[in-house]
Design a protein with these regions (language model features):
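Repeat-solenoid scaffold signature
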Residues: 442-444, 448-466
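Calmodulin-binding IQ motif helices
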Residues: 508-509
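Short amphipathic alpha-helical linker/capping segments at the junctions of internal repeats
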Residues: 522-536
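Short, flexible/disordered secondary-structure transition segments
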Residues: 455, 460, 477, 518-523
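The feature captures the LRR N-terminal capping module
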Residues: 1-413, 419-422, 435, 458, ...
Length: 555
């Protein structure tokens, strides 16, 4: 096997990142990720004291035999490479506790080597094309605490999985399970189960055996019912049931009093389950597109909520219960039919109101002094035609989205918003931008597609932090379209040169004025009036030239 594949510049990059003065035989950590490496550098394999080695996202196709020198390595990350085979020498890593081989085209047969790593606590095999889990791994590795198998083609787990008595986390997301792997219910140490994006139709009653379960992810499956025994998982803090076929929840689930995050979006609930209002420790609640028409009065008990998503429902009035949620930081009410009623939620940082029926800009939001992001684009719903000057009251606002409306002009006060970073005005009727926009020095993105702009403010290039400027579908004349098509840098250059030309013109005009006045031709104002009326200058009044061959007449 060649040891000369490594290019010198790659090694220098690795050493430079890890401080070459500190890279010695006593080095404990090396980060060689994202370096286009084709093999593991021999210089790294000589670091016998190395404990943690990151080589992810390279082009490594094989592991050199000298890997066996790294007797002390405890963490080895090799995900996102081109590994197919694992050589027996890998089994010599007697201290290895965490191994990541994800996103490699591994041959199934080569995984036998992994079963020899008896000290492993974490094994990640995401996206490796697995159709079944090697039985030998489940038989031999008795200390696994984390097993990552997401993004494969698994339909079941081997019965030997029951040997993983220390397993705390198992990740099976994006596989092909149509039946819940019941053997998991015997692993009483489990704290995290992720079965998102499978084809599960039911969860067994035995799930109640997992009394230590803290996080349970079963989003994007075909679940129509939940077992009542789930209530025995009393330590559950996260329950994600998003995008299933649920209409109701078992009333016994009100015993899950430690829940802090619940996902129920994309189900057909039609009304908020009564028991939900008893989960008073909830901080994040997702109820998007659940056919809700309102909230229960008891909803106001959820005083610890920080995030609430009620978007894409059938709510036609502002739920006053929300006003009791004083800790709310993010509120999504997009695509409902809300009037502009809003109450003071002093900690609210993100507010989504897209697709609602506002006859005008809802000025009630100006009391939300902590607001950092405001979404009021109206791809559907009643479109607004103006943004009030009082938008400046939102001193902490960083991102303002007003796309898909009928706004004809922007308030000059936008230039007085010291934290504004993103301004999305796409698909409106803007004819010009206020000059004051050039004062919004923190602006990083200015999105102006599909408006009626014919020119840009001459000082727009003063926005030194601007990274993104979009101007497509505008009848731009100044700068010319060919300049705009070249991007922001070309526009900035044009604006600067245009200013210089104007300054020169002003200087020349001032010089001409001074010259005319000094020569006694009258004041500048008189000269200008005479010129406009088409009269001759004072100089021409001193005498007229005679016709050719004739003396001029004297007066």
């Amino acid at each position: 096997m060649s040891k000369e594949v490594l290019k010198p510049e790659h090694l220098s990059k690795v050493l430079q990142r890890n401080d070459p003065q500190q890279v010695t035989d006593r080095t404990f950590f090396i980060d060689g990720s994202n370096q286009s490496l084709e093999t593991i550098p021999s210089e790294i394999l000589a670091l016998k004291e190395l404990e943690e080695l990151h080589l992810e996202n390279n082009q490594i196709a094989e592991i050199p035999p000298d890997i066996q020198n790294l007797k002390n390595v405890r963490v080895l990350y090799l995900h996102k490479n081109n590994l197919q085979c694992l050589w027996p020498e890998l089994a010599s890593l007697s201290s290895l506790e965490s191994l990541d081989l994800s996103s490699n085209p591994l041959l199934y047969s080569s995984l036998t080597v992994v079963s020899c790593l008896r000290t492993l606590r974490e094994l990640r095999l995401y996206n490796t094309g697995l159709r079944e889990v090697p039985t030998v791994i489940c038989k031999s590795l008795h200390h696994l605490e984390l097993f990552g198998l997401s993004e494969n083609h698994l339909q079941s787990l081997p019965g030997e999985i029951v040997n993983q008595t220390k397993l705390r986390e198992i990740y099976l997301k994006k596989n092909e399970f149509s039946v819940f792997p019941c053997d998991l219910c015997t692993l009483v140490s489990l704290e995290v189960i992720d079965l998102d994006h499978n084809k599960l139709k039911a969860i067994p009653e035995e799930i109640g055996n997992l009394v230590r379960l803290q996080k349970f992810y079963v989003a994007s499956n075909h679940l129509s019912l939940l077992p009542e025994s789930l209530s025995q998982c009393s330590k559950l803090s996260v329950l994600d049931l998003t995008h299933n076929l649920l209409h109701i929840l078992p009333p016994t689930l009100d015993q899950l009093t430690e829940l802090t995050e619940v996902g129920l979006s994309e189900n057909r609930l039609e009304k908020v389950p009564r028991l939900l209002c008893r989960w008073t420790q909830l901080q994040l609640l997702y109820l998007r597109n659940t056919c809700l028409r309102g909230l229960r009065r008891s909803f106001k008990r959820l005083i610890n909520l920080r995030f609430l998503d009620l978007s894409q429902n059938h709510i036609d009035h502002f739920p006053v219960q929300i006003c009791a949620l004083k800790n709310l930081e993010i509120l999504a009410l997009d695509d409902n039919k809300l009037p502009p009623t809003m109450s003071s939620l002093t900690k609210l940082k993100i507010l989504g109101l897209t697709g609602n029926d506002f006859p005008s800009f809802p000025e009630e939001i100006f009391s939300l002094v902590s607001l950092e992001k405001l979404y009021i684009g109206q791809d559907q719903g009643c479109k607004i035609s103006y943004v009030p000057e009082n938008i400046k009251k939102l001193k902490n606002l960083k991102e303002l989205y007003i796309e898909n409306n009928l706004v004809e002009q922007l308030p000059a006060s936008l230039g007085l918003m010291p934290n504004l970073e993103v301004l999305d005005c796409r698909h409106n009727l803007l004819k010009q931008l206020p000059d004051a926009i050039c004062l919004a020095q923190d602006l990083k993105e200015l999105l102006l597609e599909d408006n009626l702009l014919t020119h840009l403010p001459e000082n727009l290039d003063h926005l030194v932090n601007l990274k993104v400027l979009t101007l497509k579908k505008n009848p731009i004349e100044d700068p010319p379209m060919e300049v705009c098509a070249q991007g922001k840098d070309a526009i900035w250059k044009y604006l600067k040169e245009n200013r210089i030309r104007k300054q020169m013109a002003i200087k020349i005009q001032a010089w001409w004025r001074g010259t005319m006045v000094r020569k006694g031709y009258g004041s500048y104002e008189e000269l200008l009036k005479a010129r406009k009326k088409g009269k001759t200058s004072p100089k021409d009044k001193k005498g007229k030239k005679a016709a050719k061959g004739k003396p001029a007449k004297r007066k």
